[in-house]
């Protein structure tokens, strides 16, 4: 395909037009008085959202240079969303301000590489200042306030704080759609996985259709169990102990399954068979998680263990196991606390090293099952459009709350960024590097000014007032008051704020140092086939 090339100022301005088109659509959503954006969908109802990254992903521009500019800013939003789960609009606003100021200086003759170095040093300094000023999140109320701001709804913040209080900071909080109005919180203690009993005959509570085993032994097998002779030696030992048995295997079928069912019906021996969750390597990893949680071992030929020779010492234990037709919950496994912590650390390291969003999500679920519990927030709304928007807001707020617990919080509303600007004086830079630092100083005001503008206030006046206020004091855009924002519950996770700045600066530096852009040449659309006169050939009128 033929290419088109733009150089120098033309290239940079083309990229900037694309950036501005995207940023102008995104920035109207910033702050408590920000508006929504409607996204058309090819099928189904449109999406209404105020989430920066969702809006950015939908924007495709026609002009090839503008398209590249918009794609670069999408990266800012996506990266910020991946790292912190929020702050995508702030990152986009910062990127726009940095590029606007930077290109003005490049056009005036500044050296782009000098500006880039100055920007990088300034961002490093501001990040350091933000981290130093961050306050640890210690109370449920602080989590509720931070999550409430992210969701734009305090009741959502309160529910997320309650969920985190119950399942711990490492616990998984999932959001599901509900058929009812309002919000509900469901909690699961222990490890839960999405596989139920293989046969309905294992049920011990007919009314609830559950099988409940108190203080059972747990047999974990990585292969199928078909013949009863493999199981018999171990079954005899378990029967002598008088405890029930939970079998988790790839599958339990044929003779082995019918023997277990017959003994359960006769009341000779209480047991339940469940299929192991997952597939392939993920199944092996989850079985190993269960083994560590329950203090047992996985019976697998890979480690030289077989059912015929297995001893009762290889079985795991738990205080209670509840099995329904769809899921199994293991409560209070008897595993060694140190071994569980070791496994948690291993999974955390895998999350850090994983490039795949899907793998990371699955690892996060495994981590939660070992370290905490699972909380499910069920969200309902009047229409499907509102439901999708609400669910998305809650998911963002959950990630925001976790980021707050991780690194602490700073004053929200763009105030922390603006009030970190004086720290740049300590850098003592000269020449183009000093100009680069000044570009960052100007850009740090952009989020606050945009929040003020969206709230119907004069941005310059608000910025001047906040600049001369005490640290942490700024505009609460929801009320229009100037107050101590942390005390008023207007806080942002420092992880969100610093990620937004770092990612925006990274893309801005690339913009400024670009000297040529190579893009696909737009193809001319072919003329439609048929008679060019529009008549019907061979017809007399």
From Swiss-Prot:
Gene Ontology MF: a single term: ATP-dependent protein folding chaperone
Catalytic activity, as annotated: ATP + H2O + a folded polypeptide = ADP + phosphate + an unfolded polypeptide
Taxonomic lineage of the native organism: Bacteria, Bacillati, Actinomycetota, Actinomycetes, Mycobacteriales
Stated family: Belongs to the chaperonin (HSP60) family.
Keyword Transit peptide annotated: no
Assembly, per entry: Forms a cylinder of 14 subunits composed of two heptameric rings stacked back-to-back. Interacts with the co-chaperonin GroES.
Protein keywords: ATP-binding, Cell wall, Chaperone, Isomerase, Nucleotide-binding, Secreted
Binding site for ATP: 29-32, 86-90, 413, 476-478, 492
Name of the protein described by the UniProt record: Chaperonin GroEL 2
Any GO BP annotation: protein refolding
Gene it is expressed from: groEL2
